[in-house]
A protein has these predicted regions:
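Bacterial N-terminal signal peptides that target proteins for export
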Residues: 2-13
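Cellulosome-associated attachment modules in secreted, modular CAZymes
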Residues: 9, 24-28, 768-867
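Hydrophobic core
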Residues: 14-22
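N-terminal module-boundary/linker segments of secreted carbohydrate-active enzymes
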Residues: 28-132, 309, 313-321, 376, ...
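Extended ligand-binding clefts on enzyme/binding-domain cores
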Residues: 57-69, 136-280, 289-293, 317-723, ...
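Long, well-ordered hydrophobic secondary-structure segments characteristic of membrane-embedded
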Residues: 99-109, 122-135, 276-280, 284-303
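Long C-terminal extensions of eukaryotic subunits of large macromolecular complexes
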Residues: 715-767
């Protein structure tokens, strides 16, 4: 029955349904209506324009960008995802990351290159806005960020100090091992003095902190709604995204547990990690951590723009400054000698000459962290006032997917960037870093082709002695999954496609412009030979292992599928500085999952294939045929097929996304977060912070979130039914439009438009499959995809689907829907079968009162949308 409130909206559709003859299902183009809108599927340039319009130009309207910005001349701050319930690296979708900021720089660089070359409409200038937006995550350049109750923090005070010191502390495997033990050995950054000399007039380091709460959801900014720097992961390799304790980067001792300290009333949240047993153990301070793959992506963006004829002006200098200071990421955590194998080993001296430094590994490690005092408790007895101490640490662990030899190449050899790095020894360091990074990939490439994990100078996080079986790379030992073990950090296929894209783009520049190293050898190979060796094996493996019209073990059908997760066995041989094609025959990976993959993963794979093809002068015609025998030509064809299929099946009203399901989300409701015994405090929003709390307990703000409430209702229903943990989220589906996914899709469509403007997407006339599809997310979950609203199974969602539903409701014998159509059409209160509400909701999409991405929805949300 149709309610009175629904009659007005349904009248037209109902009349059509009652007067229509039987609906005859028709075949449609493989592209859905969003994919073809404005002719977007006719060329990759149009594809880029269509997606850029949704994500950047109208990003605020479509939910990608916040109203908060970094002042005039910037875009809105990009969220990690449009949607809110998103627990992976960020623990809330409307946080942002340095990753997202680097994509903002990268996609705006692509926009300006394409506009400058008249391949798309519009003008240049977006790159400058993109970089200004990125600077919101650089503390001293963040125009509107929360800066404490006083409204400002002097980050330049860092340079007033002669040295920065850290206390050597063990890394414990489990969160329960924290607060960890200090051993009394002081650690000093030996190149701090060089940065002070070069950049002492700046407002601190020109590095991005990795995470921020875009609109102060956690309220560490006092509930102001301001952009607020926060941090999470702090407690060992087993601390998953469900086990972190969020904390503000500006620790004002306003939250946490009440204490009888004579100077402060609260411990601060950092006390959970660092302890609170003695007065002054946690002082008012700021602290930040970078993730250098993001800085390197931003540097890559500027180099890309420059290599394609854009005058980047001051941005080249800023990118160089950022790269110069990323040398902080080339050092052991506590500046101990590489290969020391003892936590009691002394660190390099703060005054060490560059030639005497022993702690520099030259790779891009997982982070550098720094911070300092804002108002010490003993300031009343301190004539120098505030800001009288600071700390810094490097990182002992290096992962293959954090390396960016393309950025290192630019910083070492580009005439503009190399000259713009002001600190001493920067160019020499990057020449050595570039060499080490290429060798790193040669060392880690498996027999199959994908790259194994990485290495560490601190085995077990405690500088343990190496075993005789540990393979070594410049006196650091091999680690299968560096940094994180829940889940292991090198299972996800994204680690492969991100890193290899950089190698392929570098290969393209070397082939087209020559080798700027002027004959440097890498494991005995020239640069071109080394890159070709790495790429040929890797690309060959992906071509062999990519599937079309794939059906998984559960019967889920996919238009295409790439490997989604890898398990590893064996180890590489110890690196002896000479490459051997057979040295790693015992190092292999096994595909443990196939999927349509993250949008970003498929896109980045295609980007790699396009650059490899262009480097090898493959003609555009190869993209239009399967009759290729050359590997590079086969790669270009595969890129065209994957990009076309992804666009045609996953394009929706605001971007590209598939329906998702993450079985591990039950941990949101059940996972205990370790809080040390004796601690009994509160988060800024009043959430309890004491032993026994769960992820949800310390994030009570989630209780107001509609996505969270939907997930919780399904969890509780399944829990009451006695389902096992693996099945507690059965029936829970959603879409996530991640900003980095859109970023990689934009870069890849743009790259095809730039390098192969004559290649056309594949748009065969064939039935659109709306069957369920398994995909993998960054958490390694499995998902199902249905074309919500497509009741007549014609591959698009229109008023005709509402008509089909109403006809079936009125006379199911005469107007029977297909089984898949019934599933597709059940968009309101999913699970109760098709009703008039479903028809109403579909018509509301046509009337722009709902978005297709809102499906499935509830009766309550339907009523609210009608106003």
């Amino acid at each position: 029955m149709i309610s009175k409130k629904n009659k007005a909206l349904c009248a037209g559709v109902l009349a059509a349904a009652m007067s229509a003859s039987a609906i005859v299902p028709t075949f449609a183009s493989a592209a859905n209506e969003y994919a073809t809108e404005g002719g977007a599927n006719e060329s990759y340039a149009k594809m880029f324009e269509s997606l850029y319009d949704d994500v950047i130009t109208n990003g605020e309207k479509n939910g990608y960008l916040s109203k908060n910005n970094n002042g005039s001349g910037s875009f809105g701050i990009p969220y990690h995802a449009v949607e809110t319930l998103c627990v992976e690296a960020p623990d809330y979708g409307h946080e942002t990351t340095s990753e997202a900021m680097s994509y903002m720089a990268w996609v705006t660089a692509m926009h300006d290159v394409l506009a400058d070359k008249k391949l798309i409409s519009g003008s240049t200038g977006d790159l400058q806005k993109g970089w200004k937006t990125l600077e919101a995550l650089i503390p001293g350049w963040s125009a509107n960020a929360y800066a404490g109750e006083k409204g400002e923090i002097d980050y330049s005070s860092l340079w007033k100090l002669e040295k920065v010191k850290a206390d050597t502390t063990t890394e414990e495997p489990e969160p329960s091992g924290y607060p960890a033990k200090q051993n009394g050995v002081d650690a000093y950054n030996p190149i701090f003095k060089d940065f002070k000399s070069a950049y002492g007039s700046d407002n601190g380091y020109y590095l991005m902190h990795w995470l921020a709460d875009v609109e102060d959801w956690y309220q560490f900014g006092g509930g102001s709604g301001k952009f607020t720097f926060i941090n999470t992961f702090q407690r060992g390799e087993q601390e998953s995204c469900f086990e972190t304790v969020p904390q503000g980067c500006i620790e004002e001792l306003k939250y946490g547990m009440a204490v009888s300290d004579p100077h402060y009333k609260m411990t601060g949240i950092k006390a959970v990690v660092n302890g609170w047993q003695k007065e002054g153990q946690i002082a008012p301070q700021y602290s930040f951590t970078n993730a250098p793959d993001a800085e390197d992506r931003a540097i890559q963006a500027i180099y890309f723009a420059s290599m394609n004829g854009l005058d980047c002006g001051e941005l080249s200098g800023l990118a160089a400054k950022m790269g110069d200071q990323c040398r902080n990421d080339m050092f052991d955590k506590y500046y101990k000698a590489i290969g020391c194998q003892s936590i009691d080993a002394k660190s390099d001296e703060a005054t060490a000459s560059h030639s005497s430094i022993k702690s520099q590994h030259f790779l891009m490690a997982w982070y550098t962290a720094w911070g300092g005092s804002t108002f010490p408790w003993y300031a009343e007895n301190n004539p120098s006032g505030n800001y009288d101490w600071a700390f810094q640490i490097g990182c002992s662990h290096s992962h293959q997917f954090y390396q960016n030899p393309l950025a290192a190449y630019a910083l070492a050899y580009d005439p503009v960037m190399s000259k713009a790095m002001k600190a001493s020894d920067a160019v020499d360091d990057y020449k050595e870093s570039f060499k080490r990074q290429i060798e790193f990939y040669l060392w880690l490439q498996s027999k199959n082709g994908p790259f194994a994990g990485g290495c560490t100078n601190s085995k077990g996080g405690q500088y343990q002695k190496y075993d005789s079986s540990d393979p070594l790379f410049y006196d650091m030992c091999y680690v299968e999954h560096p940094v994180y073990a829940d889940p292991g950090s090198n299972h996800w296929i994204g680690n492969q496609v991100w890193s290899t894209q950089r190698l392929a783009e570098l290969y393209y520049y070397v082939k087209k412009n020559g080798d700027l190293t002027k004959g440097e050898k890498f494991g005995g190979l020239s640069l071109e030979e080394a890159l070709e060796t790495l790429l040929t094996r890797w690309i060959g493996w992906f071509i062999e292992n990519t599937e079309f019209d794939y059906v998984d073990k559960d019967g889920n059908e996919m238009a295409y599928a790439i490997p989604s997760n890898l398990d590893w066995s064996g180890k590489p041989a110890t690196w002896n500085k000479t490459y051997s094609a057979t040295a790693n025959d015992g190092l292999t990976c096994e595909i443990t999952g196939y999927s349509q993959g993250d949008i970003g993963c498929v896109s980045s794979l295609c980007n790699t294939l396009i650059y490899f093809a262009a480097a090898n002068d493959v003609k555009a015609s190869a993209a239009q045929t399967d009759d290729n025998t050359d590997l590079a030509a086969q790669g270009l064809r595969l890129a065209n097929k994957l990009m076309s299929a992804q666009w045609n099946t996953a394009r929706d009203d605001i971007g590209i996304a598939y329906e998702d399901h993450n079985g591990s989300l039950y941990r949101v409701f059940e996972q205990e977060v370790f809080i040390p015994d004796g601690f009994d405090g509160k988060m800024p929003d009043g959430s309890p912070l004491k032993p026994g709390v769960t992820f949800s307990d310390i994030r009570e703000s989630y209780a107001k979130d509609s996505m969270y409430k939907d997930a919780k209702a399904i969890y509780e229903k399944n829990k009451a039914a006695g389902k096992t943990k693996e099945d507690l989220m059965d029936g829970h589906t959603y879409k996530l439009h991640r900003f980095w996914h859109m970023g990689d899709a934009l870069m890849t469509t743009g790259t095809m438009a730039l390098l192969y403007p004559d290649v056309t997407p594949i748009n065969d006339d064939e039935p659109v499959s709306s069957s369920t599809t398994s995909t993998a997310t960054t958490t390694g979950s499995t998902s199902t995809e249905t074309l919500w609203g497509d009741a007549n199974c014609d591959g698009k969602v229109t008023v005709a689907d509402a008509t089909a539903i109403l006809q079936a409701v009125a006379n199911k014998d005469k107007f029977e829907l297909k089984a898949q159509g019934k599933l597709n059409g059940d968009v309101v209160d999913n699970g109760d079968g098709i009703t008039a509400k479903d028809a109403l909701a579909i018509q509301m999409v046509d009337a722009k009162l709902l978005k297709l991405s809102d499906f499935p929805t509830t009766s309550e949300k339907l009523e609210a949308a009608k106003g």
